[in-house]
Regions:
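Active-site His/acidic residue clusters
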Residues: 159-164, 182-230, 269, 275-276, ...
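A long, amphipathic alpha-helix that forms part
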Residues: 179-186, 215-258
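A short beta-strand-to-alpha-helix junction
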Residues: 45-50, 67-72, 96-98, 112-121, ...
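Active-site segment of extracytoplasmic enzymes that catalyze sulfate/phosphate-ester chemistry
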Residues: 29, 37-121, 126, 132, ...
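Loop/turn elements at helix/coil->beta-strand transitions in domains of secreted/extracellular proteins
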Residues: 23-28, 59-64, 130-135, 152, ...
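Histidine-centered active-site microenvironments of extracellular/periplasmic hydrolases
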Residues: 146-150, 207-209, 247-302, 312, ...
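C-terminal cap/loop subdomain of S1 sulfatases and analogous C-terminal strand-loop tails that border
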Residues: 268-273, 280-285, 302-303, 309, ...
Length: 463
């Protein structure tokens, strides 16, 4: 072959390679249950050990101001899978039952639904349509079946034979079993791009230790922030599984071709962990109940670092669809695509408002953490954050609370009386949003008994 012919042949080959469509990345999405904002080493825990998560976080982009769309499990997951705020899909609470004593509820609980409607297209369905093999492992919590809403393979934690909570037959541990299932799925996917949604049941109650780790944490000096031995074993079990998953990716040469996303469905379980300096915990709409750990790691694409850009669970839908090169459906989506931010193509997302709507009640665990209300973790409310300011609006009496999160992340200094113009502007923004998305506001409860509520409050405060 002449030199000229060889050069032309090489140019044609290079041109063809450049024109060939790039294979989309695999996606490993690890989503924990009741894992608090401070519960990982990379978020400051001084007792729980998460070396594998910490390593991934150092190599990815960590979002310090990341939020779940709800303060408890089912609505958070419905928002995540649908890309919609709660008023659109109407999964407002865990189950549709009212919480607490009916005589203590001034308003009627908006029932909503416990099932993600079949007409809502999930991001998993979008990925399926784009040629992805999809798998879901762990907690679904949205009724029907994951396989009816976009997952080729589904291993639901409640359907694993012989398991009671986190404990299985012959010493099996749930976090290990779910990790095994995810690894099996990856191995069976061949050359197809895949998305593994590993939705651990950990660290939800019942708090059950991984037995072989107990002695380690019983002998460990307690931290100033965390000291719960059983919780520590549960967290390490998850982290060890993450380490095994990364090792499996490396063995198969998939690490650089796999995006790893990590987050939690809501704040931590108040009686067992601490989100300090945040106030509140799972079930409250203070920062401790809705701010969650979140990072995205994709070697060579996502620039490592930390950002205080506020993001929220509904952002994951357009982000996952974008990462996969898939097509978004013709339905309302409330989030924004984070890929330009992850790639460093934009400096930020602008001062967009983030919203929460909870027209229901969640009964209290008990009196601790100087909580607002000893009877309910949360009463019916809406919340908005725009920039550094966050407004809570309560429907029972129309009360509002306004906080400057940059100066008062613990939400202890209510500015609603000091900044009336800002208060009214944020309240109007919230009312306008409720109108646009059809958010229901609960009506008066005919069973409410003010005297019974007062007696219950007095008993609770006395302990």
């Amino acid at each position: 072959m002449s030199h000229l012919a060889a050069v032309l042949s090489l140019c044609v080959a290079l041109s063809a390679a450049a024109a060939a469509p790039q294979r989309p990345p695999n996606i490993l999405f690890v989503y924990l249950d009741d894992f608090g904002w401070r519960d990982a080493g990379f978020m400051g825990s001084d007792f729980y050990e998460t070396p594998h998560l910490d390593s991934l976080a150092r190599e990815g982009m960590v979002f310090t101001d990341a939020y779940s769309c709800a303060a408890n499990c089912a609505p958070a997951r419905a928002c995540l899978l649908s890309g919609q705020y709660t008023p659109r899909h109407e999964v407002f609470n865990v189950g549709t039952r009212a919480r607490g004593n009916g005589k203590h509820r001034r308003l009627q609980h908006v029932p909503g639904t416990a099932t993600l409607r079949p007409d809502i297209v999930t991001w998993a369905e979008c990925l399926q349509a784009a040629g992805y093999r999809t798998g879901m492992f762990g907690k679904w919590h949205l009724g029907t079946s994951p396989q009816e809403q976009g997952f080729d393979v589904a291993v639901e934690h409640q359907k694993l034979p012989g398991f009671e909570g986190h404990l299985g037959p012959d010493g099996a541990y749930l976090a290990d079993a779910l990790t095994d299932a995810a690894i099996d799925f990856i191995e069976a996917s061949g050359d197809a791009p895949w998305c593994a949604y590993l939705a651990h049941f950990a660290v939800h109650t019942p708090l059950q230790p991984k037995a072989e780790l107990l002695a380690k944490y019983e002998a460990k000096a307690p931290g100033e922030l965390h000291d719960h031995v059983v919780m520590a074993t549960m967290i390490q079990a998850v982290d060890d599984g993450v380490g095994r998953l990364v090792a499996a990716l490396r063995e198969r040469g998939l690490e650089r071709d796999t995006v790893i996303v990590f987050s939690s469905d809501n704040g931590g379980y108040g009686p067992a962990t601490d989100m300090d300096p945040l106030w509140g915990y799972k079930g409250t709409y203070y920062e401790g109940g809705i701010r969650v750990p979140f990072f995205v790691r994709w070697p060579g694409v996502v620039e490592p670092g930390r950002t205080a850009e506020p993001v929220i669970g509904v952002d994951l839908y357009p982000t996952l669809v974008s990462l996969a090169g898939a097509t978004a459906p013709d339905q309302p989506l409330d989030g924004v695509d984070l890929v330009p931010l992850l790639k460093g193509e934009v400096p930020g997302l602008g001062e967009r408002p983030l919203y929460w709507h909870f027209p229901a009640y969640l009964q209290s665990y008990g009196v601790f953490d100087e909580q607002r209300d000893p009877l309910f973790r949360t009463r019916p409310c809406s919340v908005v954050r725009r920039g550094r300011y966050k407004l809570h609006e309560y429907f029972e009496d129309g009360a509002v609370e306004l906080y400057d999160l940059a100066a008062d992340i613990r939400e202890r200094h209510d500015l609603s009386a000091e900044l009336p113009e800002l208060r009214d502007a944020l309240r109007a923004l919230l009312e306008d949003w409720r109108g646009r998305v059809g958010a229901p506001v609960p009506a008066a409860n005919p069973e409410f008994d003010p005297a019974a509520e007062q007696r219950a409050l007095e008993r609770a405060r006395r302990g």
